[in-house]
């Protein structure tokens, strides 16, 4: 069983960066993560309502979470929003989040 810790400090609700055509800009997350790390945050909440979760596909949400974890480089916690109108998708997102950390 995992050892869970109580969260303390500021958790930012991140937006999902997109280009002019409305496609997700994963590379922008690197700069965004650097800014968050400099802001002395405890963590970021990824793909919540501020992050456009309801307008993204399950695969897009997975890719965004993976990029945030990579970009955070252990400097802050990354918390995944796994909610969905589909129970199957919510379970898939939860499993994915657990698998990648």
Question: Model-predicted segments: where are they?
Answer:
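Active-site beta->alpha loop and helix N-cap motifs at the rims of alpha/beta catalytic domains
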Residues: 2-12, 17-101
């Amino acid at each position: 069983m995992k050892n869970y810790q109580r969260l303390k400090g500021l958790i930012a609700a991140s937006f999902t960066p997109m280009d002019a055509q409305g496609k997700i800009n994963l590379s922008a997350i690197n700069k965004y993560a650097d800014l968050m790390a400099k802001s002395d945050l405890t963590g970021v909440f990824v793909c919540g309502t501020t992050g456009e979760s309801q307008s993204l596909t399950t695969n897009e949400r997975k890719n965004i979470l993976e990029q945030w974890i990579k970009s955070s480089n252990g400097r802050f916690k990354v918390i995944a929003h796994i909610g969905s109108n589909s129970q199957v998708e919510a379970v898939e997102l939860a499993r994915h989040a657990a698998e990648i950390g």
